Regions:
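Short hydrophobic helices that act as membrane-entry/anchoring signals
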Residues: 2-34
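Leloir-type glycosyltransferase catalytic cores
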Residues: 12, 16, 305-317
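Secretory-pathway luminal glycosyltransferase catalytic domains
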Residues: 34-40, 78-220
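A short, glycine/small-residue-rich beta-strand->loop->alpha-helix junction that serves as a flexible
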Residues: 43-52
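Donor-binding and catalytic core of enzymes assembling or modifying cell-surface/extracellular glycoconjugates
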Residues: 47, 219-299, 303-306
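Short amphipathic alpha-helix
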Residues: 52-60
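A short beta-strand-loop structural module common to alpha/beta enzyme folds
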Residues: 67-76
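Short, aromatic/basic amphipathic alpha-helical patches
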Residues: 80-95, 235-246, 310
């Protein structure tokens, strides 16, 4: 058994070094202009992160550049920051009509070794204006504060809700929400954002959700709340009894696991109003069906203020 493990380890190491050699050869072909240069965008995270990264690539296809997406995250890690929840590559399940080119392993390695952007993570909330000046070959592997046209122009151009991709259970709930003009979606992100996170700050707390529900109740007659979360059991066991609602006023949506999170995104989008938490899932749900009549409640946190110009009717509490 130990001998077999050693052999496997040696073979894996040989394959790794072969990939490095081939990646250098690929880079040589690039310099000789035998292969065309492109921009490769790394994809990772859940469905909303994938949507963001897809739009980042579209900035450059709109300029006429070749763009491909690196999916190695989903091959070797595919977890949240805590390593607890699965992160699946779902964007083509949610939006099967998208034009999509995947980079191969040799290509990605060549770009990472030679053409990786060195400023791919930022602590500030300003737009990453340097994106306007990028030309291929380049590897983009971070989370960028993208230019405003991503949200104003590209988001509605590329992303549309199609209930036909839903399974039977989710489609039935989608139609129920569609008929309920007083529907309010509440997204509660737990998992790796249940505690303080450097990128997102402190998590949305009980006081925030109480204020948000009371605010909605002051604006809407007979609201009905649909709860969406990566930990629905926690909502039922720990949260519901502490909120200012009664049994007839809510439903905890527990139909879709991490393999169908994109279906929850469509269900959330179909709600008339939204209460969001930290992270981008709830905001992307709002953007998919945004309107001036749609109340979207957000945490009153400077880290969330970047959404002011992206949503039509944001409310900070």
């Amino acid at each position: 058994m130990k001998e077999m493990q050693k052999i496997k380890a040696i073979v894996k190491q040989i394959i790794f070094y072969l990939k490095i050699i081939l990646s250098f050869f690929y880079t040589f072909l690039l310099y000789l202009k035998i292969v065309k240069p492109k921009i490769i965008v790394r994809m990772n995270g859940g469905i909303s992160s994938q949507m963001h990264q897809y739009l980042l690539g579209r900035i450059f296809t709109e300029k006429g550049y070749i763009v491909a997406y690196d999916l190695t995250f989903y091959k070797y890690w595919a977890k949240d920051n805590n390593g607890h929840f699965e992160r699946n590559f779902d964007i083509l399940k949610a939006f099967p009509y998208l034009e999509f080119k995947q980079s191969n392993g040799i290509e990605s390695m060549a770009y990472i070794l030679r053409f990786a952007d060195k400023t791919d993570y930022f602590d500030h909330e300003e737009e990453d204006v340097f994106l306007y000046n990028i030309k291929p070959p380049k590897f983009l592997g971070g989370y960028y504060h993208s230019p405003k046209e991503i949200w104003k122009d590209l988001f509605p151009k590329y992303f549309h809700v199609d209930p036909q991709i839903l399974d039977n259970d989710s489609h039935s709930l989608y139609m129920e929400i569609e008929k309920n003009i007083h529907s309010v979606g509440i997204h509660i992100r737990r998992g790796d954002l249940a505690v303080h996170n450097n990128a997102y700050g402190r998590p949305a707390d009980l006081d925030y959700f109480n204020k948000a529900i009371l605010y909605i109740c002051s604006k809407i007659e007979n609201p009905f709340f649909y709860f969406f979360s990566d930990e629905p059991q926690w909502i039922e066991d720990e949260l519901i009894e502490k909120l200012p609602i009664v049994d007839a006023q809510y439903k905890i949506v527990n139909k879709n696991g991490s393999d169908k999170g994109y279906m929850d995104l469509f269900l959330l989008a179909n709600c008339s109003h939204l209460i969001t938490s930290k992270g981008s899932f709830g905001k992307y749900g709002a953007l998919l069906r945004d309107s001036k009549d749609k109340i979207v409640v957000l945490c009153d946190d400077p880290l969330e203020y970047g959404w002011k110009d992206r949503l039509q009717n944001p409310v900070y509490l």
